[in-house]
Amino acid sequence: MRKLLLSAVVVSLALGLAGCDDAKNKETNSAAAAKSDAPKEGGSLIIGITSGDPLAVNPLYASDRTTLTIMQALYAPLYSFNNGNIEWGLAESLTPSADNLSYTLTLKPNLKWQDGQPLTADDVVFTFNKLLDAKQHSFFRSMFTYGGKPVEVSKVDERTVKFTLPQVSAAFTGTLVQIYPIPQHVFAGEGDLEKSTKNDAPVGSGPFKFKEYRAGQYYALTRFDDYWNGKPKLDSVTYRFAKDSNAANLALQNGEINLKMVDPQDVNRLKNTGKFDFMVYPEGRLAYMTFNQNVAVMKSKALRQAIAYAINKDELTQTAFTSLDYAKPATSFLTPDTLYKTDDVEQYKFDLQKAKDLLKTSGAPDNLKLRLAYVNTNKTQESMALYIQQALKGIGVNVELMPLDSNAMSQRSLDMNNTAWELNLGGYIMGAEPDGYKSLFMSNEAYNYAHYKNPQFDALWDKGAVETDATKRADIYKQIQQTVTNEMTYYPIAYTNATVAVDKRFGGTKEAEPKPVYLFQDLSKIYQK
C-alpha cells in the first residue's frame, strides 16, 4: 500500500512538473504571440473603395459614402457620440446656458491644422458663417435654422465660441456633432466653397493629411504627427478605387488591399480563405426606394401606394441581403437608433390585389413603364432592382433598369429638376437626432430627392426641432412618420448591417471604433502587427 501511495505521489509530482513545463511553454508562446500582435509604429493600410471617386472633399458638402469615408481621416469633429455618450474631439466642453438659448463651446488647447497653422475659435466661427450662408448651399443650413432664423455664432476668445439660438432647440447638441471645422486661412476669400480648388488638396485636422489623388486610381494620405489624439500608428492610409466589387474582392484576396466593406453575397467566400477578420455591426442605415415626383405620373399617391403593396418586403430583404443577419425589413424612414422612431405606421403588407386596384384608380396609363436607377457597383442594389422589376411586372408595370456609376447618381439626384428616372434606390445614415432627417424631406431642401412639397409637412419639421417636451416631441415625429408613410414619398426597404473584412495582419480596429459609412471613428488607432 505504501509503495502504491509513494508511486502515486511520484506520478503526481511528475505530472505536476510536466504541467509546469507545459504552462511555461504556453506562456512563452502566448507572450511571443502577444508581442507579435502588439501595436507597432509604421506600415501602410490600403482600403478598397467601390463607391466611386470622392466629390467635394469638404465637410460642409460631403454626403456620398466615398467622400465621407475619406473626410473622416482628413478632418476631425468637435465631438462624437459613442453609445449615447459624448466623446470629445477638437472640443473639450459644451455648456448650455440656464435658459438653453445659448451654448458655450471650448476647444482643446494647442490644436493645429495639418499645415501647422493654429486651429482656433476663428475657424469654428468661419465654418458656421459659411454653412449658414445661403449662397454656399450647404445642407447643414436648415439644421441650424429654427423658426426661419439661423443660429448666431460669435468668438469669445481664442478657444471659446458662443452659439446663440433664436429659440430653444432639443436638437442642437445632436446636430452640432455633425460639424467638422474647416480652416479659415485656407478658404477665406473663396466664392463657392463646394467648387473651390482648395478642396483638391484639403487641409484638415484629422489623423492623416493629404498626399496625392489620382482619379479612378487612389487617394493617398500620410500621418499627421500633431493630431489632437496622438500620433497615428500607421505611416499612411490609401483609398484604392476599384471598378466593381469583384475586382476589389480579388485585390483583397491577393493582399493588394487590406480592408473593405463587403457585400453579404461575398462573405462566405472570403471567410473560407482564412485571411480576414470580419466586423458586422448595425449601420443605423436605411436602404430605400424613392418616388421622383418631378415626373408627372409619380405625383399620383395611389400609384405610389400600389407599388408599395406590390412588393413583398420580407422576401425582397431576404433576397437582396442573402440573410436576415445582414438586414432587417424596415418599418419607418427613421432607423431603430433614432429618437422617436415608431412602428405605428401603415406597413403596406404584400397585397397583390390591392396593388392592382390602386393602380386602376391612379390615373396611370396602360402598359406603364418606369425607370429604376441604382448604383452599378452595388450588388445588393442590383438584387433589389431585379426583384422590384419582377414584382411590378405582377401588376402590369414594366420597369426599365438604369444602372449608373455612383457619381452620376449623386449629381443627377442633386438636380432639383431631375426627371431622369421615376424610381431610384439609395441609402442614408442620419444619426440619432430626428431633426437631422429634415434635409431629406422638406420642400426646398437639396437632398429632397422625392421632390415632395407640402407646407404643412414642413411646419411639422420646424415644430419638432424646437419642442423641448419629450412626449410632445415624440408625437410630432410620429405624425411626421405617418405622413411619409401615408403619402408614400419614400419606400423604406431595410435596416442594414455593415460587414467589413480586415486583413488579419492589422489590429486596433476595436479601438478605432467601427462607425457607419466612415468605417472608423479614428483611424489613428489602427496598426500593422
Task: For the regions a language model picked out, list residue spans one by one.
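A structural "hinge/loop" feature
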Residues: 50-68, 90-92, 117, 172-181, ...
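N-terminal lobe/hinge region of extracytoplasmic solute-binding protein
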Residues: 48-98, 129, 203
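Detector for C-terminal structural segments
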Residues: 311-338, 380-389, 414-529
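Surface-exposed binding/hinge segments that line
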Residues: 95, 99, 142-188
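Ligand-site clamp/hinge motif
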Residues: 224-270
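Structural transition elements
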Residues: 325-361, 378-381
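Alpha-helical secondary-structure segments
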Residues: 46, 120-126, 158-164, 206-207, ...
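Gly/Pro-rich hinge or "lid" segments in bacterial periplasmic/extracellular proteins
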Residues: 177-232, 236, 357
